[in-house]
Amino acid sequence: MKLKKIEYFSRYQEIVERYGQKGCASNDYIQREAADIIIQDNLYEFCGAKNAFLLVKKDGFWRVYYYLNDFDEVLSLDGEVLETEILFRGGLGEPAEVVAYLEKCGFKRHLVRDQYAGMYKDLKSDVENEEIIVQPAQTLTGVQAAFELFNQSFDKYSGDYVSPEVYEGLLVNHSVLLAWRKNEGEAQFLGALHQTIENNVAWVSHVAVKEEARGHHIGQALLDAFVERNMVSEKSRYMLWVQHQNEAAVRMYEKKGFKYVGKSSLSMIKL
């Protein structure tokens, strides 16, 4: 079998109808985006008799969305770098059958992320550090510097790549916050936060601090500014994903008052 490009949305629908049987295991959460991905020539299929992989072309690898009905039918795709995300409820634990199946297909465990949430009235206010200035990016150069930092700081396979084509929109919408301080009259860039708003919930999409500035509460300053800028009422809501392994980040969010909502994601990769 070889990868086959999906040319029409109707073909995507056929795959969903055929393989999306009752009781199947699936992580296909691109249904709202599928038409756009097809128009961009970035959606491919790799289908067996009972199982199917949908693959989205990324920068140097493929992100895999699966429909699994038979854990004995192995889909083996050699010579390609693959990444997939398994969503699960923390209290129930990882779906062992899905993990074991993907391991048979050549995938290995990679990272675990946990989802946290908070409401404004439950979040703690911290004392402002007057040396650290947090403001929305004012230029495209500032937005570019932020995403260069994000790309250097985060896992290339399971992170969300943002195309430079949307930088201008992020600038106009004040979606990128920059942290800096004056150093001998010059602005010293320390870190950045990228936010998105979905269904009246403010999300931390990316946050990173330059290596030489870590340990000086720059991340906390960015988080505080993000919360205050998006406060509409005491019931304003905020959400984020954080790497389970990043103990410093977990402590920062929990100190602020964010709580784990019982939802996690395991990424697996095949190199």
Residue ranges and their predicted role:
Residues 1-30, 127-160:
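Short amphipathic alpha-helix that is part of the acyltransferase structural core
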Residues 204, 225-230, 238, 249:
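Short hydrophobic clusters on alpha-helical segments that form packing/core surfaces
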Residues 56-60, 162-183, 187-208:
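A conserved beta-strand-loop-helix scaffold within acyl/acetyltransferase catalytic domains
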Residues 27-80, 191-205:
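Conserved donor-binding loop and adjoining core beta-sheet/short helix segment
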Residues 70-82, 209, 215-229, 251-255:
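Conserved acetyl-CoA-binding loop-helix of GNAT-fold acetyltransferases
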Residues 93-111, 220, 244-262:
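Conserved active-site alpha-helix within GNAT-family acetyltransferase domains
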Residues 68-132, 267-269:
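Acyl-donor-binding surface of acyltransferase catalytic domains
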Residues 88-90, 204, 238-242:
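Conserved hydrophobic beta-strand within the GNAT/NAT acetyltransferase core sheet
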